[in-house]
Structures are given as C-alpha cells and as structure tokens.
C-alpha cells in the first residue's frame, strides 16, 4: 500500500477543520504519516484521533515562513518513502510544496478539490465555471487541497480514535539551504473566536452597501458561527482589514453557506466565492450581478433584512 505524507506546518493543541479534511482524504489514499514543524510530543497528542502511523518532526519548533520547514519536508518524505504528499492550499502550504517539488524534481498540482486512488486530481477553474482533471506522472506526487473540499460526513467516518502515533525526530540544519530568508519578528493577528476565513463553513460578507458599518453583519456571523468576509471596495475603504477580502486578488473560499450583503457581485469578487455550496445574496439593486449566481436572493436594504435574519435565528435557538 502506498504511503501518504500529510504536511501540517504547525499544530495547535487541536487540529483545524482544514487539517482534519486533509487527514480524512489521506486515509483513502494509503498509509498516513504526518510531517510537522510542531514538537513531537504536541503533534502526537493532537493526532491521536487519526489513522496516522508516524509523526515526523524537527529537533526544534518550526513554523512558516521558516525555510527550514522545506528541509524537514524533504527529509521526512525520503525517510518515510512517501509517494504522495498533501498540504492545505494556503499560501504557506503552497509555498512549501512548490519548493519541495523543485528539490525532488517532482510534479505538483495546487488547489485540488479531490484526489482519487489513482492519483487523479480534480480542480475547479475559471471561477468555478469548469472542473478539470489532472494527473502527475512519476513519484512522489505533490498536491495542495482547497479547504472545505471534503464533506463533513467523509471526515467523521474516516477519523476516529486510533491510538498514539510513533514519533520520529529528524535533524534540521540551523540555517536552511541557501534560503537568504531570516525571520526577524513575528506579530500575531488580533485574536478572534470566529473561524479562519478560508476554512469557515459559513461566511458572511459585506461590500460597499455596508457603508462602513459591519456591526450588523457581525451580529449575523455570531449567530451562525461564521467568518466575516468583504469585497475589495470595503477593504480599500478601510472599513475592514484586507485579510477579509474575498475575490480574485484576495482569499478564495468554498463554504457550505455564503451570505453576500451589499455586494454587487463583480466578476473579480465572484471568482473568490462562486464555488460555495449555497449562496444567499442581499442587495437593493435587483439587477446586481450577484443574483445571477445566487441560490436565494433578497432584494432589499441589508440594514432592514439582516436584523430580521438575526432575530429569526435567535428565536429559533430559544424555542
């Protein structure tokens, strides 16, 4: 049976939804090992629920964008004999696997939404208008996988208590091979109880129509356990951080539910959210392009509509 190496650059006390999806996908492709920059003890504790046989970690804590992670990845792949390597399609995951592909002279497919037992990957392209199938010749085969591509039922059925994996510590050079990159300072983002935008199963997004006031959307997001997104117009206006931008030049999301409020739906914005399973659009302009792709549309002022949604959700929870 083939060996699948899952790259989790840094593990917290528990795994994220995107990491669990990646592990669930890997279990259907072969025996699973994990390569991580987290300490061996913490990694083994966090992965006791997954069918992971071995965890490869460095002799010191590593986290992106430390280029030594690529040294760890390379050594872990060689040590495990993995013929498939998976990472989440985040900037850090894609960067690490792209560098690894160069070192190993291997093929890489990025932003896949599914991988079958034969190694064929499906990709959603051209803002979700088409699905393509691609395959890598030779081994190892490297893939990054878009968050929210593996459904919740598959994750729950594939993962369960499986015992503590074996830990293997690999030596990593103090300085990555000729990287020229030095991490001088780390500044954590302001903490939030909301899920990460690219991993969230529900996203509430606002645009020019919020006119600088995201509070009404934050109330809705709180009721739904959702992440907050925004159009480029909203981030350029300084109403919300650019990290919340959804679109061609921002974050690409594929949630189960995407609520668009006060966003016209220009093609650049649609490119970042069109693959959502269900799209709800709220806009005063009945001719707004967003209604062309919406599953449900509400023509109205978001400041009238959204509070009614919040109230209905609260009543439903209390009943």
Which residues are covered by each model-predicted region?
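N-terminal glycine-rich FAD/FM-binding segment characteristic of electron-transfer flavoproteins
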Residues: 1-319
